[in-house]
Amino acid sequence: TTVFLADIKSNCPSRVSFQVAALPGARVEIEAIAIQGPI
């Protein structure tokens, strides 16, 4: 986050990370984004 804030002053990009070891036996990873209002 600190690195992003040094270069990007507004509209910071979203970031997602998963710890694979915390998903024992998982075969699928799902990420979703919800938007409310006009784009």
From Swiss-Prot:
Keyword Ribonucleoprotein in record: no
Organism: Gallus gallus (Chicken)
GO biological process: negative regulation of translation; regulation of cell growth
UniProtKB keywords: Cytoplasm, Endonuclease, Hydrolase, Nuclease
Gene Ontology CC annotations of this record: cytoplasm
Protein location: Cytoplasm
Quaternary state and interactors: Monomer.
InterPro entries: RutC-like_sf
Protein name (database record): Ribonuclease UK114
Lineage per the UniProt record: Eukaryota, Metazoa, Chordata, Craniata, Vertebrata
